[in-house]
């Protein structure tokens, strides 16, 4: 990796930390149930109108509110996509989606995955994009943040049974965090040249004298929350490599910052609410170390070029296949790691065209559970599961009952932690096996051999871990793949949220014990190393056999 690559990573992380720190303080106020200045009156009016109670909920009530909102959104979006030809803002007269594609798309956006088995500009109307997908981009992001709010309160409250009010949290997260920041980002994108209109597609004459139909639409408004909410679904098929979505190098840098902004701010907020900012910094250090190493590996692999092209005598000093020439290899490598470390899935380069090792790293980042910064909310509660596991392992080594932030971690919490951690690996490995065992699964593979298996493994990993990016060589728009991936997305999202909320319900009722000489410090470099080791160990033991059949075999062949 060149000095330019190091400078790019350092600049990105520096700007990220500067922006995330004040946002973290604002999020800490919301976690502590302190309204932001000037918002209390608005909140009272908004709750009185529908008659919603703002009293606190136990973990089951909180969970039911989150699940109820998401199930309602799933049903509304599903029927909206089926009948989009009856709805307004459809200047191209696009038909409704098939039932399997509508189901896949609805589940995808409700679960914050944004897997797309379709091309946006030829499949969805402006109304479906705006009133359907963009709305779910906000709600799915707010749902993930609300869950981590509840879990943080569980660690910091003592001898209580309630975790806050889900409706209050969802309202505050949406109105005072997601909407204002997304609005600022959208205005910046428009200023830089991103589209924002409701015009019919425009026929233009090219410099060669041919005619081309240019897609239009309300792009910038969807693009902003797509990145900020770590959603990732593109308005166009080319996603963020399309100049109408991502027109300049500056918008590209802002998009990467937006992906990591809230996950980073939540780490700062956790430290503030816990009363020990070192706890939040510990999580950031662990995430950042894994992130920097992964970026370095991808940059190194892509700068080496494609060995198969070199063997044919072609000039392939760097691997530019599938990459936008506006951004180049280093920026494309950084973006690939950012979008897969977080559960975003937006792309500016085709991951299917990366080298074997360059494509394996994004796949592995998804497989370990999207815990390196991760999705908004989901990344931090996923990492907290590994924190509990690391504390448990340390307790076994020193012969003490494991505890974290003064709360003892008992058998119930560890069973739920193990269940939550095992959900996505089970979906990935069994889903990939099912796809390879069936003709319907194998027929979607564009390439034979190890790379074809990598396409399958990447798709199931992306769906189960709610990322949404793809090795695009897989032809996934079929009833088999739409249903398989919809199942993986649904269980991968809510199959983790349910045990996380149960853990929160168990922890909030416990009393914190004062630290003693035998208490394991969870804020220093020793615990950072233990946490990183736990993440790597679980990832290695679970996925090395599958990776050996895919990208590793491709690299060695």
Swiss-Prot record:
Membrane topology type: Multi-pass membrane protein
Acyltransferase is among the record's keywords: no
GO cellular component term, pick one: plasma membrane
GO molecular function term, any single one: potassium ion binding
Pfam families documented for this protein: KdpA
Membrane spanning stretches: 5-25, 63-83, 132-152, 170-190, 253-273, 283-303, 329-349, 356-376, 379-399, 416-436, 484-504, 526-546
Keywords: Cell inner membrane, Cell membrane, Ion transport, Membrane, Potassium, Potassium transport, Transmembrane, Transmembrane helix, Transport
Protein localization: Cell inner membrane
Superkingdom: Bacteria
Function per UniProt: Part of the high-affinity ATP-driven potassium transport (or Kdp) system, which catalyzes the hydrolysis of ATP coupled with the electrogenic transport of potassium into the cytoplasm. This subunit binds the periplasmic potassium ions and delivers the ions to the membrane domain of KdpB through an intramembrane tunnel.
Family the UniProt entry places it in: Belongs to the KdpA family.
SUBUNIT field: The system is composed of three essential subunits: KdpA, KdpB and KdpC.
Cited HAMAP family: KdpA
Name of the protein: Potassium-transporting ATPase potassium-binding subunit
Gene: kdpA
